[in-house]
A protein has these predicted regions:
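Hydrophobic alpha-helical connector segments
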Residues: 62, 73-105
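Secondary-structure edge/capping motif, primarily at the C-terminal ends of alpha-helices
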Residues: 78, 82, 113, 165-169
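Helix-turn-helix
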Residues: 16, 20, 24-58, 62
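N-terminal intrinsically disordered/low-complexity leader segments
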Residues: 1-12, 168, 192-194
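Hydrophobic/aromatic-rich alpha-helical bundle segments in the mid-to-C-terminal region
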Residues: 106-107, 118-130, 136-194
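Short linear capping/connector segments at secondary-structure termini
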Residues: 109-115
Length: 194
């Protein structure tokens, strides 16, 4: 049975607001974008926008929660798994896919780090990254420092692939796969040394 009526329209409007807001934030920056501009781009009244979101921060928080749900699920899954090389490879694979699914949000976050520090989601971003780093570490407190750096570097290789290699020629999926391959090599080397 398909959804129709007010419930579906509300869902579509909420999604449209998120999409347009993220587009404007990317074009103009978070600080320089107003709710009025978002409403104008959507061709809705400010009252219609306020029905869904009272502030720009509310929009960003909703985007963040929607797009990072797969990462929260990944962390919960990984916490229940043994700290094997296969688990760590799967963490990297799933994280890479989650980042690809929320690419526009992650680019926004990268480009607006100063603004995000002021928002309530800034701390949650750090907490997720630290949780992932801990899950990727070798599992031994006495692991050589170089191997611990490899584990952290594996995670940030995926970020670099998305954020800094987006302007190179080629298919974005090929770039993501190449970054995942390098990240997997790093975690494998760290695990084999441990």
């Amino acid at each position: 049975m398909s959804r129709s009526g007010p419930q579906q329209r509300r869902g579509n409007t909420r999604q449209r607001i998120q999409d347009v807001a993220l587009e404007l934030f990317a074009e103009q920056g978070y600080e320089k974008t107003s709710l009025r501009e978002i409403a104008e781009r959507l061709e809705v009244t400010k009252a219609a926008l306020y029905y869904h979101f009272k502030t720009k921060e509310d929009i960003i928080i909703s985007l963040f929660e929607d797009q990072t749900r797969p990462i929260d699920e990944l962390i919960a899954w990984a916490e229940e798994q043994p700290r094997t090389l296969d688990t760590k490879r799967e963490i990297l694979r799933r994280y890479s896919e989650a980042m690809a699914g929320g690419a526009s949000l992650y680019r926004f976050m990268q480009e607006n780090q100063a603004s995000l520090r002021e928002l309530s989601i800034g701390e949650r971003v750090k907490q997720r990254l630290f949780a992932l780093v801990e899950l990727l570490r070798t599992g031994r407190e006495d692991a050589p420092l170089a191997d611990q750096v490899r584990c952290v570097s594996a995670l940030f290789t995926l970020h670099a692939g998305m954020m800094f290699l987006q302007h190179i020629e080629g298919d974005p999926e090929e770039t993501r796969q190449a970054a995942l391959e390098v990240a997997t090599d790093l975690i494998t080397q760290a695990h084999e040394q441990a």
